[in-house]
Amino acid sequence: MKWKGLLFTVLMIAMLILSACGQDASTPATGKSKESDTSEKKLKIGLSVSDLTLERWQHDRDFFVDKAEELGAEVIVQSANGDEAKQLSQIQNMLSQDLDALVIIAINSDSLTTVVEQANGEGVPVLAYDRLINGADIAAYVSFDNVRVGEMQAEYLVNLQPSGNYFLMGGSPTDNNAKMFREGQMNIIQPLVDSGAIKIVGDQWTKDWDANEALKIMENALTANKNDIDVVVASNDNTAGGAIQALDAQGLVGKVLISGQDADLAAIQRIAEGKQTMTVYKPIEAIATKSAEVAIQLAKGEKVTSDTTVNNGVIDVPFIQLDPISVGKDDIMNTIIADKFHTYEDVYKNVPESERP
């Protein structure tokens, strides 16, 4: 009997030990499964693009999506095609899709406060891409030194034509960058205006950066000044393209200096052909990939650091600032072609082979 009692006791102890071991083994397994679910969850980033009908933003989208996907994120892209109300609606729609971060290329820098507040309320950090968003608590801003862009445009033109009649063709009046470009342009031009060397014979902003609007503005400016314009300070390539159509109708292409920005293919072709004087190349791959990297950081809840900040009327926003590049006819090969931004064949397709570099 004693032997049977002892055996029963040993069996009970063994069962208790096995039961305890089973509980210990199952608890970590459950915890590991949760960690696995978290680590395997793909980050979701919303990219609100101002206008994909413009070539410039198509490049940005492609580079951004490629980099974000390489880093393991899913990207939802929507384009407002220049419509402010549509951009607001699209952003609200994206916020309903469980985003981890939101990246906005703003149409109107001053109209996004409400949707940024909504994003913040839902725990979705907002990154301003290329265009600063004013009056809102955004997490970061990635762009080029836009004042420097304007300075580069004016410097290039002033070096070639330090006196004469200048017409200022600004960008969209609702785009904060357009104002920064103008600030940079006037840093260079104003001293020459003050000295009497340069006369500003017109100054207009171009709604939505629209080429057709720029064409009309330039036609009216030429009429008002009896074609006596030496330089057009156009703030981007799209507006430059519209202005050049008006100049062409008056036989002034290649005679009137004109700036641009973005290094659109059509603009680089015009520069190669001698129709446009210069553009400012903002390496799109650089801003797109950097923005994707910053968006991933924000999506993971990581802090973004920067060397400088910019005040948007509410906070000092961490500003990741990139350097632009001035491009004239002699610079195309070692910038645009070297970076494979456009191909040699595309750029020089309208230039006789004997005149190609």
Task: Describe these PLM feature segments.
Residues 1-8:
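Bacterial N-terminal signal peptides that target proteins for export
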Residues 3, 22-357:
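A residue-level marker of the well-folded mature domains of exported/periplasmic proteins
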Residues 8-9, 232:
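Short, surface-exposed loop and linker segments with low hydrophobicity and enrichment for Pro/Ser/Thr
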Residues 17-20:
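C-terminal motif of bacterial Sec signal peptides marking the signal peptidase cleavage site
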